[in-house]
Amino acid sequence: MITTRTAKQCGQADFGWLQARYTFSFGHYFDPKLLGYASLRVLNQEVLAPGASFQPRTYPKVDILNLILEGEAEYRDSEGNHVQAKAGEALLISTQPGISYSEHNLSKEKTLTRMQLWLDACPERENPLVQKIDLKGDQQQLIASPDGSKGSLQLRQQVWLHHIELKKGEQASFQLQDRKSTRLN
């Protein structure tokens, strides 16, 4: 079954320093029919104002994938680790119990725009805490998978995530790993 949902139908937030669109129930936005999709719990588009930060917080055991669309971000954890990611990069953070994480827009002049996905992590799998790759700008790129194949980020879940960039009138086709549950955004 194919369900179509426009950006205007998504949950929205505007806190001044943060503007967001929520595909699934998140924060103050709640729709009992939209609690996630299989292991995908969060799919947000967020714009952080220049210099804005998310304060440190803990997460459930999830893999957080950030696709940086514009700007540059810094991610820190309570263990002293930090990493930066800029436009055109994908950053995967494998959250751990008891560790807090914070996020910052490094620019004092430009906004930071990103897509953020949270995927439930399999409890018995452990991966590197932070992984990063370049989004190549190819028509189609595998960006995350359970085994890190084709230079992709390695997830703690049986999920394959592709980045597909099409110009008006272009088409693409590729073989799906799991025909039972596929999502296109």
Model-derived features: positions:
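A contiguous pocket-lining binding segment that forms or flanks enzyme active sites
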Residues: 113-148, 152
